[in-house]
């Protein structure tokens, strides 16, 4: 086979045989034509304002917008959360209460949380597979997170490399 040619054609007893060099990408999300499984997850309906069971205040000293999973992780000093963060208005200044946060993985496992009066949201509901897709819903808006929640960044929404002081989780 000539270097740089992706396949070879062999002649054997008058029959043509093609051989592949293995460069095809047929794994989910890796093909030029296949879509990611996450693209099949539909946005939730528009949710009316909900009321959380508590204020969302952290008794350990955490503040809205700070790193929730610094303490709230397996083996940490506080009860572990699956995901946590703070929701703000579009300007990133005022906390938004009563919104529903959805995180759904590619296997269909769904975890939800309601934003507290201080904008904090958190849950211990389990989803077990990464990547996952996140939405925030509060009528009339339903917003989808642009990127996937992945194992590398985890579901520590306030510090996963995106949602820090300059780019808060927001609605709308």
Model-derived regions: residue spans:
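Sec-dependent bacterial lipoprotein signal peptides
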Residues: 1-18
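Sequence context surrounding c-type heme c attachment/ligation sites in exported
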Residues: 19-98, 103-172
